[in-house]
Amino acid sequence: MLDPALLRHQPADLAERLRTSRGFELDVSALESLEADRKRIQVRTQELQSLRNSRSKAIGQAKAKGEDVSAIMAEVAAFADELKASEVALDELREKIEAISMGIPNLPADDVPAGADENDNVEQSRWGTPRQFDFKVLDHVELGARNGWLDGETAAKLSGSRFTVLRGPIARLHRALAQFMVDLHTGEHGYEETNVPLLVNADSLRGTSQLPKFEDDLFKTAVGDSTRYLIPTSEVPLTNIVRDEIVDAERLPLRMTAHSMCFRAEAGSGGRDVRGMIRQHQFEKVELVSISRPEDSDAEHQRMTRCAEVVLEKLGLPYRKVLLCTGDMGFSAVKTYDLEVWLPSQETYREISSCSNCGDFQARRMQARWRNPATGKPELAHTLNGSGVAVGRAMIAVMENYQNADGSITVPEALRPYMGGLETIA
């Protein structure tokens, strides 16, 4: 959520910035009308509350003197209904203004390139050289079918489309990848391993901005009067650990990682990547989350992105780093780097990690704060999140980049300790 002061005092300027940077149209006239009504009703509410308090005090004083208080009581009763109605109206207006605020995306950093979509993203660097094959390259679906590793048909019987059953050595490789990533981030990168719930409440999703805007992409459960959501990413529970908390300055940056299942309805995917495991309703990811001081978040963002890069480098997977343009960034982000891994079957780079600095946008929603030792007062923290990395897509990249002519897969050296020393799987 943006600073409410921007909405109150600079709505026209804010609307122009949102229009040019995000393609978002803010209804300034509606906002100004609501704000004018809020101010008017708030003034009247405060007048009535002050009057109630003064008359209540007068009643107490009169009773202490043994005087008749019926006239004062009648006066209080006369404006009590107006006060109640005024308080209800004020709450309703605040809710309407908050609903508008919750639907406004974050403002991009000044150094984020302007653009409409992924075609305007700016490549920052590349690592590794794509392998030249002397045989016909198979994609992960063909490799999986050839070896009996990936079973979409059985998964469809069990759950429908966009699910996959992994069997045998490929299931082991998938598990090895997740273990390798968690060990790397905890052992070398200083993140604390955290095991989080896969079901969260609506407040958690509002805190990290999935609600209310992206509800259609969430899986929702209801048991009796209890409603919970399956997490779309462990960013949600990890970041919400500091919701309504004041973190001591010496604990920052707070770095957490979690390997978890993730669940997405893919409502806006438009039928893309229906073949194979690129885009699934259920997938696994190793997530990185940092809570930092505002002045440190830029450096923390660079560090987090580098931690994700190291995963790909240790696996020997060629990739490129891309700075997302204003039109391709996520709703909550101030700035985002994507890492895209090389897939030989597509002869292109595909996203495998997205690392974002959200500034104080999520923290304001969550009231996640830190105590500034310079002032002794609580201030909004900055939140960052990134994939470190998507496990299924890493498995796809390993399968395709390390495939052999006979359909076997060479196990990357970094994974062999997790595979019982196996050098190939077939």
Curated annotation (Swiss-Prot):
A Pfam family assignment: Seryl_tRNA_N
Location of the protein in the cell: Cytoplasm
Superkingdom of source: Bacteria
GO cellular component, one term: cytoplasm
Family matches, as InterPro entries: aa-tRNA-synt_IIb, aa-tRNA-synth_II, aa-tRNA-synth_II/BPL/LPL, Ser-tRNA-ligase_type_1, Ser-tRNA-synth_1_N, SerRS_1_N_sf, SerRS_core, tRNA-bd_arm
Binding-site positions, L-serine: T233, S234, E235, E287, S387
Annotated binding of ATP, by residue: R264, A265, E266, E351, I352, S353, S354
Keyword Cytoplasm: yes
Catalysed reactions, as listed in the record: tRNA(Ser) + L-serine + ATP = L-seryl-tRNA(Ser) + AMP + diphosphate + H(+); tRNA(Sec) + L-serine + ATP = L-seryl-tRNA(Sec) + AMP + diphosphate + H(+)
Pathway(s) it belongs to: Aminoacyl-tRNA biosynthesis; selenocysteinyl-tRNA(Sec) biosynthesis; L-seryl-tRNA(Sec) from L-serine and tRNA(Sec): step 1/1
Entry domain remark: Consists of two distinct domains, a catalytic core and a N-terminal extension that is involved in tRNA binding.
Biological role stated in the UniProt entry: Catalyzes the attachment of serine to tRNA(Ser). Is also able to aminoacylate tRNA(Sec) with serine, to form the misacylated tRNA L-seryl-tRNA(Sec), which will be further converted into selenocysteinyl-tRNA(Sec).
UniProt family annotation: Belongs to the class-II aminoacyl-tRNA synthetase family. Type-1 seryl-tRNA synthetase subfamily.
Protein name: Serine--tRNA ligase
Protein species of origin: Stenotrophomonas maltophilia (strain K279a)
